[in-house]
Amino acid sequence: SLLSDSVSFDLVILRLGGLIDQDRHPIYHLQGRKDLSDPNGVVNLVHRIDVIHAIKCLIDSNIHNGLYNLVSPDHPKREEYYTKMAGFLKLELPEFKKEKGNYKEVKGDKITQLQGFKYQGDIWLSLR
C-alpha cells in the first residue's frame, strides 16, 4: 500500500501465492519433515499457468494500475494437501503437530473480473 500510494507513475502489483507447477512444488521442501505447524491452516498456492495468463490478461485489458492477489480459489488444509501430494509423488510423508493454529485464506478473485481471466491451473496436479 505504501509503495502504490507514493508513486506518481503507473504501477500494477501482482501478489503471488506459492508458485507451483509439475516441476516446482513446496512438498519437495516439506517431505519427511517432522513437527510442521498449522495442520488446519489452508494453502494459498497459484499455478504457473495462471500467473502467465493473468499477466497476458492485464496487458490485453490495458490495465495500468492495481493490486491483484493471484491465488487459486482452491484452499485445502495444509496437512491434507501436503500429505496427499507427498503420497502422489511417492515422497516421504511430512508429519504435522496436532494443534489448532490460525489460518489466513488469501482471496484471489479480483483478477477474475478481467475479461478472459479464469483460474485454470490445478494445484492438485491432476491428483484428484
Protein language model regions, located:
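Substrate-positioning beta->alpha
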Residues: 12-16, 25-27, 35-57
